[in-house]
Structures are given as structure tokens and as C-alpha cells.
């Protein structure tokens, strides 16, 4: 982690405590990231509290929360993920982007806010593995306006660890 910091590359995941210092802000957009995979779990209540505090300190910022969470190779989010996502939105997040399961999971709208549970894989050396779904992922394009959020999905596929766009974007 020290090497990444010296190279000015942000990272999350700490074996003992939540990374409370991973906040990036620029041009009215705030970004928080948390790890929810063993053994680097940040407790749900701490995540919700950090989100709440961040939103209170930056009420006009569009707050994006990224979560490394979920169960690998599961095509649907778990009840625990859904409960945490709702807590995070209730605490003030404007958008949640998740990853870790290595497959794309559903998108939910909760109280007018979007939750991308898992974007699947983008660049990952899974060419020799058993599920074709691990060779697929999503890139999310965002346009953030004061009154609305516009997004586009760009499906990607990977071959020999090289991502490329699929034919259709949504």
C-alpha cells in the first residue's frame, strides 16, 4: 500500500480497519471506496457513517461509492449486499458501483439512485477459466448534471486479457 501511495495511486483494503482516508474530490464529485471482502471487511455501520459524514460535509457534491464486495461467480447480488446498498443510499450516496464477483450483476434503482452491484471483469486473466461470463463486463459512462444523472452502458468482452467493446451499447 505504501508503494501505491508513493506512486499517487489510490487503493482500499486494510486488514484491521476501514480506510477512512480514501476520499477523492474534484469538480463537485466526491468518490469513496470500500472493501467488503474477507479479510479486509469494513463494517457496514462504519461505511454508512463515513458516507453520512462525507455527504454532510459536502452536501452539494455528487457522492459516488465504490464497493469491492459480493460473492464470486454469483449472477445476482446477495441480500447482505442489497441491505448495505440501501443503507449507503439512505446515508447520502448518489450512486453505487460494485465489483468483485467477476460476473455482471443487476442494476437497481433505489429511491431514485442507481446501484450497479457488479460490473464484471474488465481486464483480467480469465481466458482459461470455466465461465464465459467471466470474459464479459460493463463500462459505465456517466454524465452528471445538477438535476439528473445520465448513464450509458458499454458491454466489453476480454480475449487474452485484452478488453474490447461488444457490438451494442445501451
Task: Please tell me what each predicted stretch does.
Residues 1-170:
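Acidic, metal/ion-coordinating pockets
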Amino acid at each position: 500500500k505504501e508503494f501505491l501511495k508513493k506512486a499517487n495511486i489510490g487503493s482500499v483494503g486494510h486488514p484491521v480497519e476501514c480506510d477512512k482516508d480514501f476520499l477523492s474530490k474534484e469538480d463537485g464529485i466526491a468518490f469513496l471506496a470500500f472493501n467488503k471482502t474477507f479479510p479486509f471487511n469494513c463494517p457496514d455501520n462504519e461505511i454508512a457513517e463515513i458516507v453520512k459524514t462525507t455527504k454532510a460535509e459536502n452536501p452539494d457534491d455528487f457522492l459516488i461509492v465504490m464497493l469491492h464486495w459480493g460473492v464470486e461467480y454469483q449472477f445476482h447480488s446477495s441480500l447482505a449486499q442489497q441491505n448495505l446498498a440501501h443503507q449507503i443510499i439512505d446515508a447520502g450516496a448518489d450512486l453505487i458501483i460494485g465489483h468483485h464477483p467477476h460476473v455482471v450483476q443487476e442494476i437497481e434503482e433505489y429511491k431514485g439512485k442507481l446501484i450497479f452491484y457488479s460490473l464484471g471483469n474488465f481486464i483480467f486473466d480469465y481466458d482459461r477459466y470455466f465461465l464465459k461470463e467471466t470474459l464479459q463486463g460493463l463500462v459505465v459512462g456517466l454524465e452528471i448534471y445538477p438535476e439528473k444523472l445520465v448513464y450509458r452502458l458499454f458491454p466489453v468482452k476480454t480475449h487474452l486479457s485484452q478488453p474490447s467493446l461488444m457490438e451494442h451499447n445501451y
